[in-house]
From Swiss-Prot:
The species this protein was found in: Desulfotalea psychrophila (strain LSv54 / DSM 12343)
Gene Ontology terms: cellular component: cytoplasm
UniProt superkingdom: Bacteria
Catalytic activity: AMP + ATP = 2 ADP
Subunit text: Monomer.
Protein name: Adenylate kinase
Function field: Catalyzes the reversible transfer of the terminal phosphate group between ATP and AMP. Plays an important role in cellular energy homeostasis and in adenine nucleotide metabolism.
Localisation: Cytoplasm
EC number: 2.7.4.3
Lineage of the species this protein comes from: Bacteria, Pseudomonadati, Thermodesulfobacteriota, Desulfobulbia, Desulfobulbales
Any single biological process term in GO: AMP salvage
Keywords, ordered alphabetically: ATP-binding, Cytoplasm, Kinase, Nucleotide biosynthesis, Nucleotide-binding, Transferase
One GO molecular-function entry: adenylate kinase activity
Length: 226
């Protein structure tokens, strides 16, 4: 039986890495909002071009752009046996819309996993991460041995496929990072409002995990709860 899992955590908490691990174990799609944004932006779609303006400023992409992207992805056939949502919802309004959409589609949200991490540690992690140009589900980080890029022909390449690596411009911008974290930790209109919504909702099992532990330790804690 598939599992419908929602990951929460500030940028740099490792939720994307953990999502990829859970994806592999349960063979369900890892729906990462940032990757979907990048696909739309790279494809030059109307929604993608609109989202790009907000992302480059470190602002939250408005609901009228984000929600159509995410809902359309959830409705694809590969989500029927389970899915992982990472990076969505980011506000209470989005959380309510997601819950309503799931109910309409006859889908349940089984688990909500919240990875908790100090803001300063999260910032350091963000600035050290690298993106594989071939697959966003290939996590690489210059400071973590478990997912450290490998050196080839004098440069660092993806540890999984050997592809080129890149950094996101907003990952190297301290002001943009602070702005994103400010949005996440805002309990009135930010992502924490969505977290609290699910904590108070009937249905999903909410699991809080200490994100300061090693990648392997965090994975072990998550797997014990699923």
């Amino acid at each position: 039986m598939g599992k419908n899992i929602l990951f929460f955590g500030p940028n740099g908490s490792g939720k994307g890495t953990q999502g990829a691990i859970v994806q592999k174990k349960y063979d369900i799609p890892h729906i990462e909002s940032g990757a979907i944004f990048r696909e739309h932006i790279g494809g030059g779609t109307e929604l993608g071009l609109k989202a790009k303006e907000y992302i480059e400023r470190g602002d939250l992409v408005p609901d009228e752009i984000t929600i159509p992207m995410m809902v359309s992805r959830l409705q694809k056939d590969d989500c029927k046996k389970g899915w992982i949502l990472d990076g969505f919802p980011r506000s209470k309004v989005q959380a309510i819309t997601l819950a309503e959409t799931l109910a309409k589609e006859g889908m349940a949200l089984d688990y909500v996993i919240e990875i908790v991490l100090d803001r300063d540690i999260a910032k350091e992690r963000i600035m050290g991460r690298r993106l594989c140009v071939n697959d966003n589900n290939h996590p690489n980080h210059i400071a973590f041995e478990a997912i450290k890029p490998v050196e080839k022909d004098g440069k660092l390449v993806c540890r999984v496929c050997g592809g080129d690596l890149k950094t996101r411009p907003d990952d190297q911008d301290v002001n943009a990072i602070n702005k994103r974290h400010g949005i996440y930790y805002d309990e009135e209109t930010g992502t924490m409002a969505a977290v609290n919504y699910f904590k108070n909702a009937n249905g999903p099992k909410v699991i809080s995990i200490d994100g300061s532990a090693s990648i392997g330790e965090v994975t072990e804690l998550i797997m014990k709860e699923l």
